[in-house]
Regions:
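N-terminal, membrane-interfacial amphipathic/helix-forming hydrophobic leader that caps
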Residues: 1-68
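Membrane-interface starts of transmembrane alpha-helices
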Residues: 34-50, 123-124, 152-156, 160, ...
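Residue-level signature of the transmembrane alpha-helical core
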Residues: 45, 49, 80, 84, ...
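Functionally important transmembrane alpha-helices
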Residues: 22-26, 173-199
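Membrane-interface helix/loop boundary segments of multi-pass membrane proteins
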Residues: 135-159, 186-193
């Protein structure tokens, strides 16, 4: 996976994601206007589905073997615990960055997840803590970080974090996603597995 190719892929990825999201939103709006009840959770699944679809197409076109090039190796209990501790320690920093950024931007994530909180707990976990990490870590720490890593660890962590932040398309989420992306990159590097950032 060459750096220049993955740079170009990010542009295609964002354009494709926005374009397909608009198409899906239009279809959902048409269905609702036609009297068809469309659950709100559908849009969350569609959003992650679009990301996964683009990632799969890219891997097929570039002939990327996910088993060989995406580090999904098993991690030990110590790495699991350390990953959970690292994630927990990130919470204060994320909250601080989010609150500071809200002085000049809007927290769209908080507004968008309000409806999800009305769903059963199991569904909340699946929609917020299972599907997004699995899909987004594949593309950002798997494809992007994996590509940039060949040019050096520091640059790879910064670039994967930057792209992770930019992908969220709003200042509030972009700022703390940038920090999260960098930390997750180092976690993957330390454990040699994408599972450390997923959990």
């Amino acid at each position: 996976m060459e750096v220049r190719k993955v740079n170009g892929f990010f542009i295609i990825f964002v354009i494709g994601y926005i374009g397909l999201s608009v198409v899906c939103a239009s279809i959902m709006a048409y269905a609702q206007n036609s009297g068809i009840a469309v659950p709100d959770w559908i849009q969350y699944v569609m959003s992650e589905g679009i990301i996964l679809l683009i990632a799969i197409i890219y891997m097929i076109v570039q002939k990327i073997d996910p088993i060989r090039e995406i580090p999904y190796k098993r991690i030990g209990i110590v790495d699991v615990i350390l990953s959970l501790v690292a994630g927990y320690c990130l919470i204060p920093a994320v909250l601080l960055i989010s609150n500071l950024s809200m002085l000049f931007s809007t927290n769209y994530l908080e507004e968008g997840t309000t409806t999800l909180l009305t769903y059963p707990f199991a569904m909340q976990v699946i929609l917020l803590a299972v599907i997004p990490p699995l899909v987004e870590e594949l593309i950002f720490r798997g494809i992007f970080f994996g590509s940039y890593r060949k040019a050096g660890m520091t640059g790879a962590a910064l670039m994967s974090g930057l792209l992770f932040g930019c992908f969220h398309l709003n200042i509030n989420q972009a700022l703390y996603a940038f920090v999260i992306g960098i930390v997750f990159a180092y976690m993957v590097e330390a454990t040699g597995s994408l599972w450390s950032s997923v959990i």
